[in-house]
């Protein structure tokens, strides 16, 4: 009987031991989750500390945010966590994006307003946050845009990328290459994206597309004496009666009309008289898409509200 009791005790011990072994993976998983959570919190705190250092503020610093005086650090931490919960990016990544904006000299209000735009651009274009931040801040600076306008531009870039043969990243490169020259375009960023989309459909994209479009605009704005005489003869005017640049579609459309009935050789001679020879392929691509084709694409890009979030 004593031996039977001993056998039963050993059996019970083996079962308890087996339960313990089965619980080990569960315990390890729970411990792992705890460790990951601690690391995530530590990463977030480190990222926010970097934002604080870049902005040169103390933990007690106050800022005016949407008309209210708030603790700067607490407000930015709350924003990073909110964006981390609402987007595909973690709170730490959102804090990193904040730091890129702080490096560009943005204050609390501008960071608060611009961060969602940067995150939308990064997600829509599948690009890293550093590049997205640079694109937004550089474009706002070059084109003299306000935050709301930057949000519209990102939507337009996303719409252009989804309807023409280019990407958000390539459009960003093109826009930054054109820079302040694009300020004078009548149709703003919608017309800019339309022209870049047309060029992209013809294999001219990225910085290359931006360079050619910039050259085309400059050639129309400041023509040589020979080019000016040629344009006048054809009835092509770059500026309206008030001295503002007309739309590219209208200018190039008038050039097409002026060359109507000419041979291909005659047309190319005229185009070469007005534009740089290195830009002729781009000019011909734009000329081939004036009128309704241009208007239709530009309208779809203009009506692109929320396109970045949809992508």
Where are these regions (language model features)?
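Extended hydrophobic/Leu-rich segments
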Residues: 2-5, 9, 65, 267, ...
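Membrane-penetrating hydrophobic segments
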Residues: 3-27
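Juxtamembrane loop-helix boundary motifs flanking transmembrane segments in multi-pass membrane proteins
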Residues: 4, 8-11, 149, 170, ...
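Small-residue helix-packing and pore-constriction motifs in hydrophobic alpha-helices
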Residues: 25-84, 93-104, 111-124, 131-163, ...
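Flexible, active-site-adjacent loop/turn segments at secondary-structure boundaries
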Residues: 42, 127, 166, 218, ...
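Hydrophobic, often aromatic-rich secondary-structure segments at membrane interfaces
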Residues: 81, 239, 246, 250-311
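N-terminal glycine-rich anion-binding loops that anchor highly charged ligand groups
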Residues: 87
